[in-house]
């Protein structure tokens, strides 16, 4: 009679891993508004998350869960690759990553919308005013490309990281596309 291999520990190098029980790994944003909202949600559920002031990379949550504190934009990749079992991040970041993850639950926070902006002295006053061939700067090139393709608008996507709003002011692009929780204009 052969024992089930699923119940035996597996020896891998110098580390012993048990296949009978392990903590659920949850990837959580390590900073920003999304991290603050997530910490509050988990605290309300009886799973207090450490303050990020301690610079921890991970923490146990109630003995059954392990929190992994990572950049919000890396969470889709960590979940898709199996580094984390589940994650909390923005849907905009999931869409941009193009990673095969499943959306399970809308937590009711972190809502934002895709916006386009141009300089105040620009002829562009709406999405429809963006001329063919216009340069559009964004830190969300995949989402922006899909958006303009769906509208049959031929634009040149200029991928940038960080503060996209500087691009029109520097002449890098005529328009920016980003996600925002508020209305704003370039000056």
Task: List the predicted regions and their residue ranges.
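Low-complexity, intrinsically disordered segments with a bias for serine/threonine
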Residues: 8-9, 22
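Short alpha-helix boundary/capping segments
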Residues: 1-8
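Domain-level signature for soluble enzymes in the chorismate/prephenate branch of the shikimate pathway
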Residues: 18-187
């Amino acid at each position: 009679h052969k024992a089930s291999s699923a119940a035996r520990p597996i020896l891998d190098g110098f580390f012993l891993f048990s296949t009978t029980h392990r903590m659920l790994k949850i990837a959580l944003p390590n900073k920003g508004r999304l991290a603050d909202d997530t910490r509050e949600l988990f605290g309300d559920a009886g799973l207090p998350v450490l303050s990020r002031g301690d610079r921890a990379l991970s923490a146990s949550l109630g003995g059954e869960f392990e929190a992994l504190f990572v950049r919000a934009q890396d969470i889709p990749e960590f979940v898709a690759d199996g580094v984390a079992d589940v994650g909390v991040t923005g849907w905009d970041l999931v869409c941009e990553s193009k990673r095969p993850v499943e959306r399970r639950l809308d937590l009711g926070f972190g809502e934002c919308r895709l916006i386009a902006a141009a300089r105040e002295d620009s002829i562009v006053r709406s999405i429809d005013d963006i001329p063919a061939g216009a340069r559009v700067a964004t830190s969300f090139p995949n989402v922006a490309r899909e958006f303009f393709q769906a509208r049959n608008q031929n634009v040149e996507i200029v991928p940038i990281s960080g503060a996209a709003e500087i691009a029109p002011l520097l002449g890098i692009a005529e328009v920016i596309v980003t996600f925002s929780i508020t209305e704003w204009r370039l000056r």
